[in-house]
Amino acid sequence: MSSGRIVQIIGAVIDVEFPRDGVPSVYNALKVEGAETTLEVQQQLGDGVVRTIAMGSTEGLKRGLNVIDSGAAISVPVGKATLGRIMDVLGNPIDEAGPIGEEERWGIHRDAPSFADQAGGNDLLETGIKVIDLVCPFAKGGKVGLFGGAGVGKTVNMMELIRNIAIEHSGYSVFAGVGERTREGNDFYHEMKDSNVLDKVALVYGQMNEPPGNRLRVALTGLTMAEKFRDEGNDVLLFVDNIYRYTLAGTEVSALLGRMPSAVGYQPTLAEEMGVLQERITSTKEGSITSIQAVYVPADDLTDPSPATTFAHLDATVVLSRDIASLGIYPAVDPLDSTSRQLDPNVIGNEHYETARGVQYVLQRYKELKDIIAILGMDELSESDKQLVSRARKIQRFLSQPFFVAEVFTGSPGKYVSLKDTIAGFSGILKGDYDHLPEQAFYMVGSIEEAVEKAKKL
């Protein structure tokens, strides 16, 4: 164990000088004597000086303080002891319920599974949310991104998915709160507690008031815990809210580490940092990790380097649209922009595929006709186009759905719609079976039977 001393502090970045024969390796964890702070080595600058990122506040630190090299990377508790607990980036409990009592700790920097160990699957994961199951179905062991600007419903959608999947799914889940609001983390904890699934969930939080070092590493902490469950042969769910903040934390420290910024001020290592995280989120022959990640889209611009880099790693992308939210249609998923590699007749079967493509065709055609309607009015359309517009408006409304987690706001009870009912409902609308019903009957209902019942009351 060599020891050194602090020679420079710039915000979250600290330079430490060690004897030349005892320079710590990159990613080693260092402890500051007399303070609770842990540092992680990022660069070796030469002459025995290393540049580190602080995993915690640097207030009260000063030059000359002694620093001890732990000789290993940051390690966190893994295994069953983490279930039902809330931890920080270093694996310390923050729920005031005593020590974790883990039997094993793993380092947070690990290699991705080799190509030979990886396993792919085509099994569908039913979410109970109509628009997602229809247009961008999730794969078991796949990676899903929820893309959306500020305030279009990423976290509410994430909570509903967690409720529907984690409660219906009997396995373990890990939730990593990366740079999000503490209130949301709190809501999530109580949601899990009330649903009696807390004993199957490990929670790791590095919220937005924490230093960038914590936000940069907390995703890896959560992922390490998920990998342990996977390697024990379980099917694990990994929820990350929000991947963008992980990128942003890297941006915050990048300039302080002395790197030249690249496009839009992001770190030059953006693609590599994202790849290191995403390549580890994968399924092996032992078990699977199904991950659902919220991705904040700055200024609603999907071509921003951060969301654009994330796109490449995903199996399904759920794009939330402000235009759809402004119509009062929730979940505000854009059925024309959202995609999934599962949307293939060989995987999901012809009926599902034809229905999904039919819905997209009708909505796309309606989008094209909107300009004509705005200028000339509905009367100028041909009979077939009038019929198509009427069906498109019904489909648009039928894509909305009351959520369980939003019952407190909406006052209407949540609905879980099975894939079979979803396909039956949309294919019925496309065939014209429900042309006689008013379009408001389709708004905020679960299955098509409920729309028929609602129409009787209108």
Swiss-Prot record:
The protein's enzyme class: translocase
Family annotation (SUPFAM superfamilies): C-terminal domain of alpha and beta subunits of F1 ATP synthase (SSF47917), N-terminal domain of alpha and beta subunits of F1 ATP synthase (SSF50615), P-loop containing nucleoside triphosphate hydrolases (SSF52540)
Residues that span the membrane, as ranges: none
GO molecular function: ATP binding; ATP hydrolysis activity; proton-transporting ATP synthase activity, rotational mechanism
Membrane topology field: Peripheral membrane protein
One Pfam family of this chain: ATP-synt_VA_C
Entry GO terms, CC: plasma membrane; proton-transporting ATP synthase complex
Major location (coarse): membrane
Catalytic activity: ATP + H2O + 4 H(+)(in) = ADP + phosphate + 5 H(+)(out)
Known EC number: 7.1.2.2
InterPro entries in the cross-refs: AAA+_ATPase, ATP-synt_VA_C, ATP_synth_F1_bsu, ATPase_a/bsu_AS, ATPase_alpha/beta_chains, ATPase_F1/V1/A1_a/bsu_N, ATPase_F1/V1/A1_a/bsu_N_sf, ATPase_F1/V1/A1_a/bsu_nucl-bd
Amino-acid positions noted as binding ATP in the UniProt annotation, renumbered to this chain: 148-155
Compartments, record wording: Cell inner membrane
Keywords: ATP synthesis, ATP-binding, Cell inner membrane, Cell membrane, CF(1), Hydrogen ion transport, Ion transport, Membrane, Nucleotide-binding, Translocase, Transport
PANTHER family in the record: ATP SYNTHASE, ATP SYNTHASE SUBUNIT BETA, MITOCHONDRIAL
Subunit record text: F-type ATPases have 2 components, CF(1) - the catalytic core - and CF(0) - the membrane proton channel. CF(1) has five subunits: alpha(3), beta(3), gamma(1), delta(1), epsilon(1). CF(0) has three main subunits: a(1), b(2) and c(9-12). The alpha and beta chains form an alternating ring which encloses part of the gamma chain. CF(1) is attached to CF(0) by a central stalk formed by the gamma and epsilon chains, while a peripheral stalk is formed by the delta and b chains.
NCBIfam families in the cross-refs: atpD
Sequence similarity: Belongs to the ATPase alpha/beta chains family.
Functional description taken from the UniProt entry: Produces ATP from ADP in the presence of a proton gradient across the membrane. The catalytic sites are hosted primarily by the beta subunits.
UniProt-recorded name of the protein: ATP synthase subunit beta
Organism: Pseudomonas putida (strain W619)
Phylogenetic placement of the source organism: Bacteria, Pseudomonadati, Pseudomonadota, Gammaproteobacteria, Pseudomonadales
